[in-house]
Amino acid sequence: MAKKVVEVLKLQIPAGKANPSPPVGPALGQRGINIMEFCKAFNEKTKDMMGFTIPVEITVFSDRSFTFITKQPPATDLLKKAAGIQKGSSNPLKDKVGKITKAQLKEVAEKKLPDLNTDDIEQAMKILAGSARSMGIEIVD
């Protein structure tokens, strides 16, 4: 018989840096999950994505076991890294804080494609171009 799903948790944790302190510890502890087991598994799975915040979806079962799925880093993090900036513009219409090329945009779109609600790379590029525009990042040819 299949295990009964009790809850699905969504967290954003820095890659390779999950530890029992907040927000991870309290979120998992109150659901009876072995926190250290999750931290070790998450850190092992995300060690090659250091420097990014990784969205993770944790499925908790009735017998206190769990599974988790890691997603790609947020589009904003990927765009900031491609543009070489620390943060987006506070006024994106007036202040442009960085530039990325269409090739860089395509690279980010290919990385983010599994998490977007499209299968077309051109459509994914349009979605990410909108995010870049709202961050004050200019797209050049």
UniProtKB/Swiss-Prot annotation:
Biological processes annotated in GO: translation
Pfam families noted in UniProt: Ribosomal_L11, Ribosomal_L11_N
Gene Ontology cellular-component terms listed: cytosolic large ribosomal subunit
Listed GO MF terms: large ribosomal subunit rRNA binding; structural constituent of ribosome
PROSITE patterns, per the entry: RIBOSOMAL_L11 (PS00359)
Record has Ribosomal protein as a keyword: yes
Subunit-level organization: Part of the ribosomal stalk of the 50S ribosomal subunit. Interacts with L10 and the large rRNA to form the base of the stalk. L10 forms an elongated spine to which L12 dimers bind in a sequential fashion forming a multimeric L10(L12)X complex.
Similarity field: Belongs to the universal ribosomal protein uL11 family.
Name of this protein: Large ribosomal subunit protein uL11
Protein species of origin: Nautilia profundicola (strain ATCC BAA-1463 / DSM 18972 / AmH)
Lineage of the organism: Bacteria, Pseudomonadati, Campylobacterota, Epsilonproteobacteria, Nautiliales
Gene: rplK
